Amino acid sequence: MLQSRDGDVEAYNHLVSRWEKRVYNYLLRLVRDPEDSLDLSQDVFLKAYQSLRRLEDPARFSAWLFRIAHNEAFSLLRKRRPETELADQAPPSPPAAKMLPVETSLAVASALNRLSEDQREAVILKMYQGFKFEEIAGILECPVSTVKSRVYTALDLLKETLAPIETRGDA
């Protein structure tokens, strides 16, 4: 990290290799479009490279990087909000006797899409990216208590939404 900050391009390429998949997956879960996620990932790493010297605490690199990703994703989402409002109205899940793993993944994705943007992002950062509440608070620029509230409320909603699926899977 320090070598990258000092302008070592090879060291930065190593950082990109280490983080690109996580950043891409995070963006994909937020913007829900593979091409946009790829474009945003490139923008994130370009902005990170350009701003790396301003990073004061190298130990906070991951939170700093995901803050850039957050900003880029929500900038895009604000631009295209009118066209996504209709897409967010997902039809209810069809009943099934038993769900296959792919169907379960789709059900979880659909349930995540029903959460508010704030809740979805907090859950993604906590459950999929493994950040601590304090790190998420830094990324989202809000109090830790707000992050906890968003995560726990979202998990309750997900549990409620996915409970019928779990029941069907036990049959």
Predicted regions located by residue number:
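Arg/Lys-rich amphipathic alpha helix in sigma70-family domain 2
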Residues: 50-57, 67-86, 101, 153, ...
